[in-house]
C-alpha cells in the first residue's frame, strides 16, 4: 500500500483589531502634502511634495493626504454633517462616545432626570 501526503498552504488575515491598530497608526502619522503644478514637455504635471520640509519625507509605505478632513464638530450642510452639539455623551467613557471627544473640547452639561414609569412588574 502506498502513502499519500497532502501539503496545504494558505494566507490568513490578522485579527481585525491588529488591522485596525495598524491603520490607526498610519493615520496618526500621515504626512500632509501639497499639490504642485509644473509644465513639462508633455503639458502640465501635478506632483505631491511634503508641506513641511523639516519632517522626514514619507516613504512609499506611509499614508499621505493633501486635503484636511472636514470639521465634524460643527454643522456643515455641504458635507451633510449635523455636528456634535446637543448630542448625548458618556461622561465615564474615553472612547468615541465619551464627552471629551464627542463634545470637541467645548465642555458638556450634565443633566439628571428622575422618571416615574409603570414597570408592569409581577410579584
From Swiss-Prot:
Cellular compartment(s): Secreted, Extracellular space, Extracellular matrix; Secreted
Keyword Ion transport listed: no
Glycosylation site positions: 90
Keywords, comma-separated and alphabetical: Developmental protein, Disulfide bond, Extracellular matrix, Glycoprotein, Lipoprotein, Secreted, Wnt signaling pathway
Principal location: secreted
Molecular function per GO: cytokine activity; frizzled binding
Cited SMART domains: WNT1 (SM00097)
Lipid-conjugated positions (O-palmitoleoyl serine): 1
Annotated S-S bridges: 89-104
Cellular component GO terms held in the UniProt record: extracellular space
Biological processes, Gene Ontology terms: canonical Wnt signaling pathway; cell fate commitment; neuron differentiation
Highest taxon in the source lineage: Eukaryota
Post-translational modifications: Disulfide bonds have critical and distinct roles in secretion and activity. Loss of each conserved cysteine results in high molecular weight oxidized Wnt oligomers, which are formed through inter-Wnt disulfide bonding.
Task of the protein: Ligand for members of the frizzled family of seven transmembrane receptors. Functions in the canonical Wnt signaling pathway that results in activation of transcription factors of the TCF/LEF family. Required for normal embryonic mesoderm development and formation of caudal somites. Required for normal morphogenesis of the developing neural tube.
Similarity comment: family membership: Belongs to the Wnt family.
Protein name per its UniProtKB record: Protein Wnt-3a
Species per Swiss-Prot/TrEMBL record: Plethodon jordani
Gene name linked to the record: WNT-3A
Amino acid at each position: 500500500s502506498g502513502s499519500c501526503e497532502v501539503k496545504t498552504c494558505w494566507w490568513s488575515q490578522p485579527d481585525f483589531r491588529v488591522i485596525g491598530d495598524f491603520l490607526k497608526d498610519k493615520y496618526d502619522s500621515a504626512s500632509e502634502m501639497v499639490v504642485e503644478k509644473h509644465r513639462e514637455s508633455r503639458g502640465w504635471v501635478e506632483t505631491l511634495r511634503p508641506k513641511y520640509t523639516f519632517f522626514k519625507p514619507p516613504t512609499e509605505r506611509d499614508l499621505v493626504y493633501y486635503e484636511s478632513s472636514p470639521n465634524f464638530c460643527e454643522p456643515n450642510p455641504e458635507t451633510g454633517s449635523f455636528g456634535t452639539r446637543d448630542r448625548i455623551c458618556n461622561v465615564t467613557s474615553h472612547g468615541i462616545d465619551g464627552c471629551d471627544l464627542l463634545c470637541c473640547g467645548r465642555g458638556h452639561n450634565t443633566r439628571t432626570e428622575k422618571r416615574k414609569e409603570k414597570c408592569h412588574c409581577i410579584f
